[in-house]
Curated annotation (Swiss-Prot):
Ranges for region Disordered: 208-230
Main function: May play an important role in host-pathogen interactions and in ESAT-6 secretion.
Record carries keyword Phosphoprotein: no
Disruption phenotype: Deletion of the gene does not affect the synthesis of the major virulence factor ESAT-6, but greatly reduces its secretion. In infected macrophages, Rv1057 deletion significantly reduces the secretion levels of cytokines IL-1 beta, IL-10, TNF-alpha, and INF-gamma, but does not affect IL-4 and IL-8 levels. Deletion of Rv1057 greatly impairs the ability of M.tuberculosis to replicate in macrophages.
Official protein name in the record: Seven-bladed beta-propeller protein Rv1057
Source organism, top-level taxon: Bacteria
Length: 393
């Protein structure tokens, strides 16, 4: 056991079984050359038929058909695309963050027609974005000299309708933003002078038929409603100290658990498990297998696995036992996404390639997991602790 910020941190069991990439029984690996340079972001359509990736180096967004594992469309002239979110209701709609010398912006892309439908300029520097479950609102985490915040765009009009400060502490920056499955809570990974933070924000009241009210900042003491719309704005309800620098955040499919991946010089890669109801860290897991930086984390659709992306591999963590149950070695992975049916894991990398591997080839069976848990030396603890008008704002 180790101690980190007053909390003991469990380290991995020496008995954990690790599968090397492509060597597990029944493994099936397909390489998809996108050939657009380093891939910064990846998303998959709700039906699993399309992958959409951002190619920062070539100013393009590529669409890949998962049935053929081939690039079917390439959207050009998208300035330095990075973060991406796919529509839930609008299956062919993608929202992509872009960068230019004048401003960052959100590009709205129809991936079926290879068309940029609109571009919405924003003040400050965009770090990440996420959509509400009904696709009505886009939440964008931003950084600037005045601090870090989350901006809200109406996806129908492109208008900026709300901003909430994540922190007014100098030097604080947002890293990522995630939304609960029911759309009621935002989770923002941030880093400040004293370390990593998970900031919990409730979304606007939707008492007026799902519409949200006039623009306001949470730091203002009052705001006037427009018409009969709800006046309540986004509100920070909790800030959870993580310690090491936050790299990414992922939520379980039911929203009950948040997994925060962080990295520091003292403990390396760490995953904090947080109860989203109580806002308490229930356990912390230092993963010594990851020697370099952990950069991304995502959770499988059945909530059984967490995928941790690092410099030369994807590490698979059992969310029930918190044991490492698989390792997928591949060159310089950047991001991952699991297919909606849970059969495949798509791993994008900095060489411009997507690797598809069968999920069954990366994990051990449930029986093996139980055996590992019985043999392992793990100990756990409860810590004390269309073109629209610019939306610049």
């Amino acid at each position: 056991m180790s101690v980190m910020n007053g909390r003991e941190v469990a380290r991995e069991s020496r008995d954990a079984q690790v599968f090397e990439f492509g060597t597990a029984p029944g493994s099936a690996v397909v390489k998809i050359p996108v050939q657009g340079g380093p891939i910064g972001g990846i998303a998959i359509s709700r039906d699993g038929s399309l992958l959409v990736v951002t190619n920062n180096g070539t100013d393009t967004v590529s669409v890949v058909g998962t049935d053929t594992c081939r690039v079917t469309q390439t959207v050009t002239s998208v300035n330095e695309p990075f973060a991406i979110a796919m529509g839930n209701a609008e299956a062919n709609r993608a929202y992509v963050s872009t960068v230019s010398s004048a401003y960052d912006a959100i590009a709205v892309i129809d991936v079926a027609t290879n068309t940029v439908l609109g571009t919405h300029p924003l003040a400050l520097s965009v770090s990440d974005l996420t959509l509400s479950p009904d696709d009505k609102y886009l939440y964008v985490s931003r950084n600037g000299t005045r601090g870090a915040d989350v901006a809200v765009l109406d996806t129908t009009t492109g208008a900026l309708i709300d901003v909430v400060d994540v922190s007014q502490a100098p030097g604080t920056t947002t890293q990522c933003v995630r939304m609960s499955p029911d759309g009621s809570v935002l989770y923002v990974g941030a880093n400040g002078p004293s370390g990593g933070l998970l900031v919990v924000i409730t979304t606007r009241a939707q008492s007026d038929g799902g519409r949200i009210g006039s623009r306001s900042r949470s730091r203002q003491k009052s705001s006037k409603p427009r018409g009969n719309q709800a006046a309540a704005g986004l509100r920070v309800v909790a800030t959870i100290d993580i310690g090491s620098s936050v790299r990414d955040v992922a939520l379980s499919p039911d929203g009950a658990i948040a997994y925060v991946a962080s990295c520091g010089s003292d403990f390396g890669a760490v995953v904090d498990v947080i109860d989203t109801r109580t806002h308490q860290i229930t356990s912390s897991r230092a993963i010594s297998e990851i020697g370099g930086l952990v950069t991304r984390v995502s959770v499988s659709g059945d909530a059984d696995r967490a995928y941790l992306v690092s410099e030369d591999r994807v590490t698979v963590l059992c969310t029930r036992t918190h044991d490492v149950i698989g390792t997928i070695r591949t060159g310089q992975p950047s991001c991952v996404v699991e297919s909606p049916d849970g059969k495949y894991l798509y791993i994008a990398d900095y060489s411009g390639t997507i690797t598809r591997t069968a999920v069954a080839s990366t994990i051990v069976s449930g029986t093996e997991q139980l055996a590992l848990q019985r043999r392992g030396s793990m100990q756990w603890f409860s810590p004390e602790l269309q073109q629209y008008a610019p939306a610049l704002a």
